[in-house]
Amino acid sequence: MSEVEHQELDLNGEMLARREKLAKLREQGNPFPNTFRRDAYAEKLHAQYDEVEGEALKEQDIQVKVAGRIMLKRVMGKASFFTIQDVSGQIQLYVARDNLAEGVYADKVSMWDLGDIVGAAGTLFKTKTGELTVRCSEVELLTKSLRPLPNKVQGLTDQETRYRQRYLDLISNEESRRTFMIRSKMVSGIRQFFLEKDFIEVETPMLQVIPGGAAAKPFITHHNALDVDMYLRIAPELYLKRLVVGGFERVFELNRNFRNEGVSVRHNPEFTMIEYYQAYADYHDLMDNTEELLRKLAIDILGTTTVPYGEYVFDFGKPFERITMHDAIVKYGNGITREDLDSFEKSVEIAKGLGIEIQKSWGLGSVVNAIFEEVAEHQLIQPTFLMAHPAEISPLARRNDENPEVTDRFELFIGGREIGNGFSELNDAEDQAERFDAQVAAKDAGDDEAMFKDEDFVVALEHGLPPTAGEGLGIDRLAMIFANAPSIRDVILFPAMRQK
């Protein structure tokens, strides 16, 4: 018999034994009671009483009601120790036959297994080893677990199982619970940051007739009642800018986007972003905003502006570097000159030498961008704003007044990865229409990620968009940094997985 077959046999036997216990418990009443009114959490109890001496604790006679999942169990005849886990941490229970009502220990507590959820009321005390413990006078089974937990020594270590059965991961791994608590705190902090700056939070369509706001492949669906193909949004940008046209001068949306592309340690087809727009501001203002936001998040979440991530330590306390795309290539490109990047023929030659496959629809701007991604992107380790992107690859960004071939745009890179993208918005309706036409031509030439033309958005611009800047920040990638997580799947509760 194989190891897998042995494990399946053991599992089946364990589940059968638990179901038999459940049947006996049903004879005594409902083993799934509706409520238990607890008044204490493990973390707060430890914070308040871990340093209190045993005698002093006994004199205080502190009564508590706790609840949680059984993670450890030690049976010693007429008494047992259980370690239960709630959302905040773990606390030990001392359950003795003589401290409970008659028959409770033999008929009920004896049926408890690892993974069961229980409630207990009693008095705090310290064991001989000094561990804070609840001496239970009342106990109640709240939920019977029919499946055993992962091995209590090894925990849940299989990565794929952790992603597919996130509930087991959260039960078994404190680090995973910490990761998602960090993410939650980060999201709350971001929302509060913008609300305090007088932004209003809005919601824009997830289903769109024309997907826009980014260069990406959309998911396609069909609306039966309207008999029209629709797309899951790739970005909320064009709708948010319509709102600025309408007079909402500071707006943000913190929500999901969808892109029908590859899955990797940095990419999930369903992901979270905050996108915000500020009238009467430019891209320099947004870079300042971003520095302020990340510095505040680091302090609020980690208590410091130095953020460890893998082999790196990011410094959010000092001003972020600001460098143009062309200067970054010259800096890291091993002899590539600015003059090289001004020549289409020379840039193509350099790109081919780097193994880059040139697309038919590419102009000079796309070639230069591909060279940057190959030679410089991975070098931007400390927080860096990359600026002055070619207009060709920035169809929604405002052209730079001094050099119309590039735009007033920035991307935020941390650890060699893009975290955010922002720019002074293009508010010239005629220029926008021309750039949409160029995107349509690129799509016709085979570029699946080129943008659709949104005529209604052009009409909105014709009514007048004030000088505006906007930015999108990837929530998942930011969470990776603050939680020191190597994969985007580690910070998404239920990441996309191939079906078994």
From Swiss-Prot:
Keywords: Aminoacyl-tRNA synthetase, ATP-binding, Cytoplasm, Ligase, Magnesium, Metal-binding, Nucleotide-binding, Protein biosynthesis
Cofactor(s) recorded in Swiss-Prot or TrEMBL: Mg(2+)
Details of cofactor binding: Binds 3 Mg(2+) ions per subunit.
Subcellular location: Cytoplasm
GO molecular function, one term: tRNA binding
Catalytic activity annotation: tRNA(Lys) + L-lysine + ATP = L-lysyl-tRNA(Lys) + AMP + diphosphate
Binding positions for Mg(2+) 1 per the UniProt entry: 411, 418
Top-rank taxon: Bacteria
Signal sequence, start to end: none
SUPFAM superfamilies: Class II aaRS and biotin synthetases (SSF55681), Nucleic acid-binding proteins (SSF50249)
Main location: cytoplasm
Keyword Magnesium included in the entry's annotation: yes
Disulfide bonds: none
Residues annotated for Mg(2+) 2 binding in this entry: 418
Entry EC no(s): 6.1.1.6
InterPro entries on file: Aa-tRNA-synt_II (IPR004364), aa-tRNA-synth_II (IPR006195), aa-tRNA-synth_II/BPL/LPL (IPR045864), Lys-tRNA-ligase_II (IPR002313), Lys-tRNA-ligase_II_bac/euk (IPR034762), Lys-tRNA-ligase_II_N (IPR044136), Lys-tRNA-synth_II_C (IPR018149), NA-bd_OB-fold (IPR012340)
GO annotation terms (biological process): lysyl-tRNA aminoacylation
GO cellular component entries: cytosol
Quaternary structure, from the entry: Homodimer.
Alphabetical list of HAMAP family matching this protein: Lys_tRNA_synth_class2
Entry's family note: Belongs to the class-II aminoacyl-tRNA synthetase family.
Annotated protein name in UniProt: Lysine--tRNA ligase
Record organism: Actinobacillus pleuropneumoniae serotype 7 (strain AP76)
Name of the gene encoding the protein in the UniProt record: lysS
